[in-house]
Curated annotation (Swiss-Prot):
Homodimer. Forms a heterodimer with the C-terminal cleavage product (49 kDa form). Forms a heterodimer with the N-terminal cleavage product (10 kDa form). Interacts with PEX5. Interacts with LONP2. It comes from Mus musculus (Mouse). The active site is at residues 374, 410, 483. This is Peroxisomal leader peptide-processing protease. Inhibited by N-ethylmaleimide (NEM). Not affected by leupeptin or trans-epoxysuccinyl-l-leucylamido-(4-gianidino) butane (E64). SUPFAM superfamilies: Trypsin-like serine proteases (SSF50494).
């Protein structure tokens, strides 16, 4: 994953674990499981997701919604709750020794899949420590997370936000879905039974990044166990890389791809190396029945503040536990503005409102914005352009050009009544390199409520006609509202193109946010330069008169006599 990730990967894998909850004497009742973060090995302290505890709450999940409740004592759950924590080898427990003790795929679920122990499986299987019993110290939440969640998601009934660990069409009871929604933002602090002294290193396992120290666009590493306690030999501490896409106080979003079971897993920074930034609150987010490709996080620092406060109140005689919780990383600056976009080029993204329609845009000159035709479709229409950086401003503008609906290039140009002071003008790229890291900045998902989001990926394809680029494809997550936003090179910061659309399967209705299309800036730059210098729209008008091969590309059609069948 690159040299910069080495230290973070080691910390993540040392801190990752899986937590299982079951009922005493009821093995047939099944179990609940999630991922967790080892905060301290001696004594053993683990922070995990609170959703697995809702079946055990004496008063039901309604206890999690009481106003002013930031924590619940461990005895809020029934006496038949049994907890176990499992992790991989520690530094004092080499993989070789564990491999000798636990031959092959050691969990029953893996054996039931037909993965029999043997030399090949032993080489691939992950050595594990035996599950250890644990005690629930308290359930805790971050009030600020819940407040921001209610503001951003609570009243959005029309868009039907969906956070359960399944697709919207899957069979999930209303009661189960309500329990999962109530448990969002709730976590649990556990004390793990002590193991062999030789394996225990006293003190915190991780350091914690202060709230606001990681800015939008910063690289993140998520570590969790897909499907929880199922087959940890294979899935324990699976890594996923992404960036901090957006932030509202302690409520964070990342485009790192996480699966059900990774709830409670840790999310770590590349710089400072291995600092714990957040825990996974919901690995799958759906909006209007479409997967948005983002993971919901809760910042770790405020959670640990609640944990210290709660331990002092619930366990006055256990002050040593509070002391052993990880401290914030003092080398990280505090109090960075939460709306800081990080990379300076990202500030060129703006929100464009045209009547009841809104989308994204990019500043290409102090008084010139480019967006999509379907965002601002009528020439001479007045639009309102919002910029979030360096400060929130709104400036009126007029659509001076919009391509015709028959044009394959979905483009509109807005002339502003005033200059957008302080907004950097991006450098247009002259060349494109397939495979290079790229970023999309746009107002999809939240619109103006939370500022622009940043998603990362690679330039997966450059489609050319007669040797000239006419379409760019990326693996960045692109959502409704991102249309018209900029596509940047993550390395150079150069403007590569204008986001036009993601992909939708008309047969199934499924949307694929990680397959999307952008208009290369090289198609637009000569005409934009001509208009900016002379006011002449002639170059832009040429976008309405493209060749048939370009139209074929943007219709996503091939000039074949027979459409090839999929072999899948």
């Amino acid at each position: 994953m690159g040299r910069q990730w080495g230290p973070s990967m080691r910390v993540a894998e040392q801190a990752g674990c899986v937590v299982s909850a079951s009922r005493a004497g009821q093995p047939d009742a099944g179990s609940w499981s999630c991922s967790g973060v080892i905060l301290s090995r001696n004594p053993g302290l683990v922070l995990c997701h609170g959703g697995i505890f809702t079946p055990f709450l004496r008063t039901g999940s309604a206890a999690l919604t009481q106003t002013g409740t930031a924590f619940l004592p461990g005895d809020s759950c029934s006496d038949d709750l049994r907890l176990h924590v499992q992790w991989g080898p520690t530094a004092a427990s080499p993989a070789g020794r564990a491999d000798q003790e636990l031959p092959g795929l050691c969990t029953p679920q893996c054996a039931s899949l037909g993965l029999e122990p043997g030399a090949p499986s032993r080489a691939r299987a992950r050595p594990l420590q035996p599950p250890r019993p644990a005690q629930l110290l308290l359930l805790l939440s971050c009030p600020a997370f819940r407040s921001h969640f209610a503001r951003l998601f609570g009243a959005d009934a029309v868009d039907q936000w969906h956070f359960v660990s399944s697709a919207p069409d899957d069979a999930v009871s209303e009661e189960e879905e309500e329990d999962q929604l109530r448990a969002l933002g709730w976590f649990a602090l556990l004390r793990v039974q002590r193991g062999a002294a030789a394996e225990e290193r006293r003190g915190p396992v991780v350091t914690v990044a202060p709230l606001g120290a990681v800015v939008k666009g910063a690289p993140l590493l998520a570590c969790g166990s897909p499907f929880g306690a199922f087959c940890p030999d294979i899935f324990l501490n699976t890594l996923s890389r992404g960036v901090l896409s957006n932030a509202a106080g302690p409520l964070l979003l990342t485009d790192a791809r996480c699966l059900p079971g990774t709830e409670g897993g840790g999310v770590f920074a590349a710089r400072p190396a291995g600092a714990l930034v957040a825990l996974v609150a919901a690995p799958l987010c759906w909006k209007a029945r479409e997967w948005v490709g983002l993971t919901l996080l809760c910042a770790a620092a405020p959670l640990l503040q609640v944990a210290r406060w709660a331990l002092a109140r619930l366990h006055p005689g256990s002050a040593s536990l509070s002391v052993l919780l990880p401290p914030p990383d003092v080398s990280t600056p505090r109090g960075l503005p939460l709306r800081d976009l990080g990379p300076p080029w990202a500030a060129a993204a703006v929100l464009v409102e045209c009547g009841t329609v809104w989308g994204s845009g990019v500043v290409v000159a102090p008084r010139l914005v480019v967006t999509c035709r379907h965002v601002a479709p009528r020439e001479a229409a007045r639009v309102l352009v919002h910029s979030a950086t360096p400060k929130n401003v709104a400036i009126w503008g007029q659509v001076v050009f919009a391509t015709q609906e028959t044009s394959p290039y979905d483009i509109a140009v807005v002339s502003l009544e005033e200059e957008l002071n302080g907004v950097p003008t991006p450098v247009p790229a002259g060349h494109f390199h397939e495979g290079e890291p790229v970023s999309v900045v746009g107002f999809g998902v939240f619109g103006q409520a939370c500022g622009p989001s940043v998603t990362s990926g690679i330039l997966s394809a450059v489609v050319r006609v007669d040797g000239s680029p006419v379409m760019l494809q990326t693996t960045c997550a692109v959502h409704g509202g991102s249309s018209g936003g900029p596509l940047f090179s993550s390395g150079s910061g150069d403007l590569l193109g204008i986001v036009a659309s993601n992909t939708r399967d008309n047969n199934t209705g499924a949307t694929y946010p990680h397959l999307n299309f952008s208009i290369p800036i090289t198609v637009l730059q000569p005409a934009l330069k001509q208009y900016s210098q002379t006011g002449d729209l002639g170059g832009l008008r040429e976008l309405d008169h493209t060749t048939e091969p370009v139209r074929v590309v943007w219709r996503l059609q091939r000039p074949l006599s027979e459409v090839p069948r999929s072999k899948l």
